[in-house]
């Protein structure tokens, strides 16, 4: 149980497993780059990784909350906004009404302004041609991918418990 204060307001935070605390104040420095978490946790269980055990399973934020946060950042003059998640490509699969990462990017692209959207990390197992098409058509999404290329060896990828192989990477790029 923790209490945070900001500008005279008090926020109480209780750790409730599997929930996302929305509307918490975010302290950002400068007005150039901002980072926006779109999801928390991970479902991949790579052999060497502790994230699913300490952060839990994937939990996506509501699209409306993300769009509102990015709209506010653009209004405040931020020029580069990076969307964050252990595996952004699986965004929205856990929501009551499942959504798609490409759909989120398309919604964010509708926000007027002079800004660039980036995202990381983009796991190849959930990358789709719909995502690439959305990126290609977008006015604001950077035409680059942050792919965690940790090995080009199928044997090593299997040992890492990665559900894809070198051929899948080559298909994507």
Per-region residue spans from a language model:
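Proteins enriched for Cys/Gly/acidic motifs involved in redox and nucleic-acid/cofactor modification
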Residues: 1-91, 145, 167-173
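Conserved SAM/AdoMet-binding glycine-rich loop
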Residues: 75-173
């Amino acid at each position: 149980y923790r209490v945070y204060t900001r500008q005279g307001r008090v926020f109480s935070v209780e750790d409730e497993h599997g929930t996302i605390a929305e509307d918490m104040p975010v302290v950002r420095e400068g007005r150039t780059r901002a980072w926006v978490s779109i999801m928390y946790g991970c479902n991949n269980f790579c052999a060497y990784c502790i994230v699913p055990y300490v952060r839990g399973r994937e939990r996506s934020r509501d699209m409306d909350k993300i769009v509102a946060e990015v709209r506010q950042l653009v209004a405040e003059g931020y020029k580069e906004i990076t969307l964050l998640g252990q595996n952004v490509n699986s965004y929205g699969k856990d929501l009551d009404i499942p959504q798609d990462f490409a759909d989120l990017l398309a919604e964010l692209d509708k926000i007027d302004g002079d800004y660039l959207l980036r995202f990381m990390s983009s796991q190849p197992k959930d990358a789709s041609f719909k995502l690439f098409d959305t990126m290609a058509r977008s006015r604001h999404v950077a035409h680059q991918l942050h792919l965690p290329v940790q090995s080009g060896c199928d044997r090593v990828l299997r040992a890492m418990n990665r559900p894809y192989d070198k051929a899948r990477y080559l298909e994507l790029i």
